[in-house]
Amino acid sequence: MMTEAERASIAADGTDGLLGKRGKGVFHIHTLGCQMNVHDSERIAGVLEANGYVPATEDQINDNDLDLLVLNTCAVRENAAERMYGTIGRFNRVKLVRPNLQIAVGGCMAQLDRKKIADTAPWVSAVFGTKNIEDLPKLLDQNRATGKAQVQVTEQLRQFPSQLPAARASRISSWVAISVGCNNTCTFCIVPTTRGKEKDRRPGDILDEIRQCVADGAKEVTLLGQNVNSFGYGIGDRYAFSKLLRACGTIDGLERVRFTSPHPAAFTDDVIAAMAETPNIMHQLHFPLQSGSDRILRAMRRSYRSAKFLDILGRIRAAMPDAQISTDIIVGFPGETEEDFQQTMDVVRQARFSSAFTFIYSPRPGTPAAAMEQIPRDVVQDRFDRLVALQEQITEENLATFEGRDVEVMITGKLGKKDTDTHRVTGREKTGVLVHIGVPEGEPVPEIGDFVTATVTHAGRHNLLADPDVAAGQTYSVRH
């Protein structure tokens, strides 16, 4: 794995450095799906770099000047499979121009559909799963030697992906997986099939990784798991997750900690207290509802009901009045009636989520819900549109409450030309809301990773604007 210093040296050396020599090949990873896939893509990149491959520059990506394309796939929704095959088809068009290009497909769809991928797309060089990322370099070598597609997908996890080298996409924000897999049996979900049963990492290993991230320059980490708050249940410690959160609060230099995704059934008061009492745990929570109908929740095998869900939200907000809580909602689950849908709308009105990821139900082969009677598409679309309209209204009303308030924003991402021309920087405030900040005239532009405290002057539909008038007493300050 290359260090930041080595990357900088390569960039400075140009054609005389490793990029000029191309190593074993120049690669690019295209990632579909969730945050866990983003985490895994960083591990795929780390494994490739450790084996002599070189990450592509932006110009090389734009020019298709590549020796290896890796697709890390998602299997959560039906259109994810369609996107995968569409992307593989686009990769083939690149291969027609660059015959020596290798194409590798990994992730959840590879775990699920390995043979079909190889049969449908004979131009694919290697297929690997979620549990054997470390095998990719060997599969690529075998493909080069034999000219035949290499398919290797294992069912048992040999080691946590987090134990593999990582080439992190961000210098200041890091993903840290605390577990893999899921022990729940939701009737709509394919994740237990593709990721397996839940396995937890040792708390000491997790904390060591976080400390290393901070030593490497990270100011923020996001703890990842399919059900983070059931962490430790397998060894009989139901307080393990809240202990982990509190331990994060003892790490010097770690400014912000987030986590995703918890399961409402296991969201207990000790976790709420840890969030409220640990200064660097952000008051941001993604809390999947899925449906507000108890009948549908039962059919989904979600082990909570709407009253319990709302009760937990009430306890969270009592402890953290500033908490921003987002959710997932599925519309059109098999058997959903208009009455069921209205119950979901009622819960959304009461919960007042900061935002919602709303999905039209899509059957996943092999899940119990796929065999149930489906609802006509036009009915589902109408319900979906009504739910989105309601949530958009709530989101706008919520963002409007930020106007006139001072927020601390961590500057993230690259500054584009538009931002430079308008003298703006972008980042997220503590509860995760996106904020665009106008830098006052005469002030230097903050660097990525700086913290800017500024007065919010306008609330948009999905973000905030801070154009502070310092002369009028509004706030603008920078902390490095």
UniProtKB/Swiss-Prot annotation:
Binding site for [4Fe-4S] cluster 2: C182, C186, C189
A Pfam family reported for this protein in Swiss-Prot or TrEMBL: Radical_SAM
Keywords of the record: 4Fe-4S, Cytoplasm, Iron, Iron-sulfur, Metal-binding, S-adenosyl-L-methionine, Transferase, tRNA processing
Note on how the cofactor is bound: Binds 2 [4Fe-4S] clusters. One cluster is coordinated with 3 cysteines and an exchangeable S-adenosyl-L-methionine.
EC number: 2.8.4.3
Cofactor(s), names only, from the UniProt record: [4Fe-4S] cluster
Protein name: tRNA-2-methylthio-N(6)-dimethylallyladenosine synthase
Upper classification of the organism: Bacteria, Bacillati, Actinomycetota, Actinomycetes, Bifidobacteriales
Gene name, Swiss-Prot/TrEMBL: miaB
